[in-house]
Amino acid sequence: MVVMLVLVPLSGCFGIGGEGGIFGDEPEKEPLRLNHIQMEGTHNSYHVEPIFSPTREYMYTHEPLDVQAAQLGVRQFEIDVWWDVRDGLRVYHNQYDSGTTCATFQICLETLLAWSQANDQHHPMMIWIEPKDWPEQAADITTTVELSGLLQEIESEIAEFWPRNLTITPDDVRGEWPTLNEAVLTDGWPLLEESRGKVIFVLLARGDMRDLYLEDYPGLNGALMFTLSDLGSGEAAIFSLTDPIGDGEQIAQLVTDGYIVRTRADSGGEEPDNNDTVRFEAALAAGAHTISTDYPGPVEGMDYWIAVPNGTPSPVSYTHLTLPTILLV
């Protein structure tokens, strides 16, 4: 079964526009901002299924990043980053699940940037970066790296391989407000039309990893990445709640308040194996902005995959005004 979504506003405020622009019979009553769209995302966006998989959750393969963007409408990507003594920042899941469509962080960024610059009117993308700090076993050598050094290297490569003028940073959103959180709750996110062709980077880490990053960039001043910060903190702007069924009410409240929220439509193979879209439907109903999946397109022999509504990569969400009416057709 393919799930298609049509968002129908309860109050006629906007037309639903694709990436070519917003249209409708009525004039806009409020400018569209970054948190007024929903986008399809992929989990472990670089992933290639291993030849011999030790577990069901590794049994999926993604198209290359630019193909996901061009053909599947994916606008949110997740990249795991490891430090390697030979190759610097490498991209793979773990040592038992190392297949990847872009072997290094640089290659991943360059692949997405090339597509972005060739399609410079696309809705803004989000790139979630998860640093991995487990020791790597290679050639009988155990390599470790200080977490702060890993974060600095990630920040450095973002600055080197992605143009600053095509990046939406915490400083851009904060503006003249004392904190990022105040800016999000008061002025809101940047306008959608001013954000086309740009990207938001998010550090997918909590605990010590996040705290080390905030030590380097207090209040995220000067930072290139947003963080998953606690509600009420000065850095709070973006949240990841991966269970849209159990966390649906919290997701909906965060969305209503003006935060950007990521969730997941499937995890570990249970949903695709049972052609179960309940989790996906819950994510849509809660108004989550990015909905991540292992199956953004058709897979031979499987009925389950997550379809973008009407082929539009980022449908307008009405959750900032009222919850959408969701029709599954």
State what each model feature region is.
Residues 1-22:
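Secretory targeting signatures
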Residues 9, 287, 327:
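Conserved functional loop/turn residues at catalytic and ligand-binding sites
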Residues 22-321:
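Catalytic cores of phosphodiester-bond hydrolases, prominently lipid phosphodiesterases
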Residues 323-329:
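Single conserved hydrophobic/aromatic residue that forms the stacking wall/gate
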